Amino acid sequence: MKSNFKEFLLRELNEVRKELIETASKIKLPEYDWHPRLDMKSAKDLLVEICGCEVWINTLMKGKLIQWDEAEAKVKGEDLQSILNELDNARKETIDFLNSKTNEELFNPIENLPQDIKDYWKGDIIPAEAIEFTLRHEYYHLGQLIYNRWLLGYNPYKE
C-alpha cells in the first residue's frame, strides 16, 4: 500500500496541536508569564512563537516573505485564550492549504516564487517540507512548555 503523506501530515498536525492545547490549558495565570531564567521564554512567548512560525510558513507558501518578528506581530492578544484562538486560526489555514492539494502536489515546488524567497529558503519551497518544519518547530516548543511546567513542580508522568 502506498503511503499517503498528506494524511500523515494531517494526523500529525492534529495530534501535536491536541497535545499543545492539553498542556497549555493547564497553565495557571501566574505561570503564563514566568521565565525559567531571564533570558528564556515564558509560556506565553513560546505559544506566540509557535503561532508566529505557522503564520510565517503559511505566508511563505502564498509566495510572500515576511520577517519572523512581523509574523509574530500578527498574533493578536495577550491572554492565553486569545493566543489559543490565534493558534487555531493559523492551524485552520494550514489544514485548508493541505486539503487543497493532492498528495503528489505536496511534493511539487511552489511555482512563481520571487527569487528573494528562494534565496531565503535556499531553494524551492516544497509544501510537504514546509509543513513538516511547522510540525517539528511546534513539537520542539511543546517539549519546552512541558519541561518548564515540570520545573514548577508539575510532573507530566503523574498528572
PLM ranges: what are they?
Residues 10-14, 21, 29-73, 114-159:
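Short, contiguous alpha-helical
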Residues 1-12:
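Extreme N-terminal tail/first-helix region
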Residues 13, 17-20, 24, 87, ...:
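Hydrophobic alpha-helical core bundles mediating ligand binding, dimerization, or RNAP-core interactions
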Residues 8-10, 22-24, 108:
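Short linear motifs at secondary-structure transitions and domain/linker junctions
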Residues 26-27, 56, 93, 97:
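Short alpha-helical scaffold segments that flank and stabilize functional sites
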Residues 76-112, 125-138:
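Acidic/histidine-rich alpha-helical segments that form the ligand environment
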